[in-house]
A protein has these predicted regions:
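Outer-membrane beta-barrel strand-turn architecture
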Residues: 42, 88-92, 132-138, 185-189, ...
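Outer-membrane beta-barrel biogenesis signature
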Residues: 19-60, 137, 143, 311-318
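Residues on the lipid-exposed face of transmembrane beta-strands in outer-membrane beta-barrel proteins
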Residues: 50, 82-86, 126-130, 146-148, ...
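Transmembrane beta-strands of outer-membrane beta-barrel proteins
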Residues: 46-50, 94-96, 126, 140-146, ...
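Outer membrane beta-barrel transmembrane domains
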Residues: 59-63, 67-70, 212-318
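Transmembrane beta-strands of outer-membrane beta-barrel pores
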Residues: 52-58, 98-104, 132, 148-154, ...
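Residues that define the transmembrane beta-barrel architecture of outer-membrane proteins
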Residues: 44, 76-80, 118-124, 140, ...
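Outer-membrane pore/translocation modules
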Residues: 103-199, 203-211
Length: 318
């Protein structure tokens, strides 16, 4: 009975705030992963990358100002993914990625504290990358990419018989298509490296028994500086600008409290602990946030991972 009352109040609350305070802090689908350095690999090489990410949000914003809303305490997720990249040829790479949400939850006060939780497999990402340009002097590379995200995970997840909101579903429920452009340059002294990328993603319309929804387009621009401290330790500083268009529902109606502009600073450290094995850790800190309407925004996130590049050609020839 207690759970039933809680969900009734929660459902009414969500209907009330949908046009005023829609949460985009942990929207459905996979977080952007990877170490941010999208250099291509050679033919018959295989790069495996495992990562874990934690994100926490407890700050409501109206436009670019923080405000207090007493109902939602926080939203968070814990997500792990496995990514594999294979060198099909000297210029072509193909990449796949699949992840799992161990915890995608929201804590609310209605008036007692309740935690609503989603979990499960996210979206399957498949990306092809092409090396457009490669120079020896200066040592630099330009790579283009095209990818799709397929909603293989659960999108109609409920909790004790009550359907979870779209922001807590482990999958997006929509096909997504993305393009990217990545540039890297290494200085002659091999101490400094510079990277940049442009990324854009388009989402198809969701039409299910429970949701009629379309996520807004997503755009990202990032600049990286990488410095070699020792033979095994590297530091990276990333500045990233993210743009999200407004989401839409029936009759192509835009949802006012969706869409944002956020600037992040992301320090990172990489440790080459054995041959081509690397450990990495990264924090994402919002420097500036501007949202449409009232939105629950990200306070911080951090991630860590390990990646290894294998030379399959050598192994097969032995």
């Amino acid at each position: 009975m207690k759970n039933a009352v809680a969900y009734l109040i929660f459902s009414i609350f969500f209907l009330f705030i949908e046009s005023e305070a829609y949460s985009q802090c942990c929207s459905a689908g996979n977080p952007v992963s990877g170490d941010g350095q999208q250099k291509s690999i050679n033919k018959n090489q295989l790069r495996i990358y495992w990562s874990f990410k934690h994100s926490y949000s407890d700050q409501y914003f109206f436009k670019n100002k923080k405000e207090d809303i007493p109902f939602i305490d926080n939203s968070r997720f814990n997500y792990s993914s496995l990514q594999a990249t294979y060198g099909v040829s000297k210029k072509w790479n193909i990449q796949t990625e699949l992840g799992y949400f161990f915890d995608k939850s929201q804590t609310v006060e209605i008036p007692e504290k309740y935690v609503f939780k989603g979990f499960g497999i996210g979206d399957l990402g498949i990306t092809t990358k092409y090396q457009i340009l490669s120079l020896i002097k200066p040592q630099s590379e330009l790579v283009g990419s095209f990818g799709v995200k397929i909603p293989v995970g659960k999108f109609d997840q409920d909790m004790d018989g009550a359907m979870l909101p779209i922001s807590l579903q482990p999958s997006t429920g929509a096909m997504k298509y993305n393009i990217g452009l990545y540039y890297s340059r290494v200085n002659l002294n091999n101490k400094w490296s510079f990277y940049s990328f442009l990324f854009a993603e388009y989402s198809s319309l969701i039409q299910s028994d429970f949701f009629y929804y379309k996520y807004g387009n997503y755009y990202s621009l990032a600049l990286f500086g990488k410095y070699k401290l020792t033979n095994r330790i590297y530091t990276v500083l990333q500045l990233r600008q993210e743009f999200r268009d407004k989401d839409k529902r029936e009759n192509d109606e835009k949802i006012e409290s969706t869409g944002s502009k956020v600037t992040y600073m992301a320090p990172q450290i990489l440790y080459n602990f054995y041959e081509s094995w690397y450990l990495l850790a990264q924090a994402d800190v919002p420097l500036y946030k501007y949202v449409n309407g009232h939105q629950l925004t990200n306070k911080y996130s951090f991630s860590f991972g390990v990646h290894k590049t294998l030379n399959l050609h050598k192994k097969s020839s032995e």
